[in-house]
Amino acid sequence: MDIRPSEISKILKEQIKNFDQKAEVSEIGWVLSVGDGIARVYGLDNVQAGEMVSFSNGVRGMALNLEIDNVGVVIFGSDRDIREGDCVKRLGAIVEVPVGPALLGRVVDALGNPIDGKGPLKATEYRRVDVKAPGIIPRQSVHEPMSTGLKAIDALIPIGRGQRELVIGDRQTGKTAILLDAFLNQKPFHEKDAGNEKDKVYCIYVAIGQKRSTVAQFVKVLEERGALEYSIIVAATASDPAPMQFIAPLAGCAMGEYFRDNGQHALIGYDDLSKQAVAYRQMSLLLRRPPGREAYPGDVFYLHSRLLERAAKLNAENGSGSLTALPVIETQANDVSAYIPTNVISITDGQIFLETNLFYQGIRPAVNVGLSVSRVGSAAQIKAMKQVAGSIKGELAQYREMAAFAQFGSDLDASTQRLLNRGARLTELLKQPQFSPLKTEEQVVVIFAGVNGYLDALAVADVGRFEQGLLTLLRSDHSDLLQAIADQKQLTDDIKDKLIVVLNTYAKNFS
């Protein structure tokens, strides 16, 4: 075999030229003990609170407890393949998730990894999950309506863009249904020509500790009704570890803040925060933090307040964007005075209180109008809605008061009887089937008919039929009237006169 020295020297020179001695320095530690989704790690002396770490099998974790001789790490994933003595690396980054329009229409887990089988995300931007809420100066008071399409809510407990409105009630009272209807109600704004960017509301649904079948059902409804294209679903289901359920709302909020900070509008539903509190309690107890009331850690109030304070309406200098939050809390046997419910009630700007017995009476959405409030109030309504909703609030309040007394006496004077009849019909009018949100102008017309006595002569059972017929008539023959209310945002004398003519004719012919 012929060896050519020139060739050998050429190969050696080539290899020397390409030799690049890169040393990777990473700070490491070792697992002392692991179990229940928590690892105790020795080493990692310079790790920061909330920093991501990586175990030797690729699972990520987050350093939460920084003690003198060890670090308490919560594991974002299964702890089955982590052993005592395994190597743990610092990643030098706080927990981040992908954000931006690339996530719309997708289902992701709490760390932003897609779980819907539609391939990888095309997101280019990442954000920290736990950031400080905007201060006082960049904010503006809530003044634009965030319509849910539900008469009972938009008329009596209005929600504004940038508000935090709690949806609270027992299990199976229709809490998720309210979120779903609010999401579906944003569809018309996305159908119009793209010039109307300021009306578009992007929706984020965070499922915490729910059954996978429930989340799949939610996604299916959004998909069938064409609402998935402007929604993001963040799912940390019941089978996910507690740290994932704890971080999911923060991740969803970071995704919503992207829209808020870019001058757009977003609506986020946390379903539900009681399960996040339970997951946080589990983590805290396993990390040996001292328990407080109901064994929750002392900072569970701070956990929820720093999350919900991130929902805000920003002023014009900061782009006029908004993030509206609808946190859900599940109560046990209507006990609103438990620890987590009272905490979240005191943080939010009002609550929608749903009751089991109303639900079983067929009053759906099962909103208890007496206990529900919106602390933003009529600032979050257009003038047309204020004009008709003011009187319905008063009449329903009087009706509730009278109905309690009327149970005892049978001989009621005519005015009381009239009040009870009107109240029963208005209550019937506020009922609404699921998946059928109404536009604001349609709600205005329906409530106008109710408070002006057009329902008084009807049997209670006919109210729903009357409403359906009226809406069908308006949509087909008087769409200009609806459009006028939508454009002028108030009931001018001219619109009122036209409306009364239509209602008189319709009521006369209704049988």
Curated annotation (Swiss-Prot):
Gene3D superfamilies: 2.40.30.20, ATP synthase alpha/beta chain, C-terminal domain, P-loop containing nucleotide triphosphate hydrolases. The record marks 372 as: Required for activity. It comes from Bartonella henselae (strain ATCC 49882 / DSM 28221 / CCUG 30454 / Houston 1) (Rochalimaea henselae). It is found in: Cell inner membrane. ATP binds at residues 169-176. Pfam families: ATP-synt_ab (PF00006), ATP-synt_ab_C (PF00306), ATP-synt_ab_N (PF02874). Keywords: ATP synthesis, ATP-binding, Cell inner membrane, Cell membrane, CF(1), Hydrogen ion transport, Ion transport, Membrane, Nucleotide-binding, Translocase, Transport. Its EC number is 7.1.2.2. Produces ATP from ADP in the presence of a proton gradient across the membrane. The alpha chain is a regulatory subunit. It is an enzyme of class 7 (translocase). Belongs to the ATPase alpha/beta chains family. This is ATP synthase subunit alpha. F-type ATPases have 2 components, CF(1) - the catalytic core - and CF(0) - the membrane proton channel. CF(1) has five subunits: alpha(3), beta(3), gamma(1), delta(1), epsilon(1). CF(0) has three main subunits: a(1), b(2) and c(9-12). The alpha and beta chains form an alternating ring which encloses part of the gamma chain. CF(1) is attached to CF(0) by a central stalk formed by the gamma and epsilon chains, while a peripheral stalk is formed by the delta and b chains. Its main location: membrane. GO terms for cellular component: plasma membrane; proton-transporting ATP synthase complex. InterPro entries: ATP_synth_asu-like_sf, ATP_synth_asu_C, ATP_synth_asu_C_sf, ATP_synth_F1_a_nt-bd_dom, ATP_synth_F1_asu, ATPase_a/bsu_AS, ATPase_F1/V1/A1_a/bsu_N, ATPase_F1/V1/A1_a/bsu_N_sf. GO terms for molecular function: ADP binding; ATP binding; proton-transporting ATP synthase activity, rotational mechanism. HAMAP family: ATP_synth_alpha_bact. Coiled coil: none annotated. It is a peripheral membrane protein. It comes from the Bacteria. It catalyses: ATP + H2O + 4 H(+)(in) = ADP + phosphate + 5 H(+)(out).
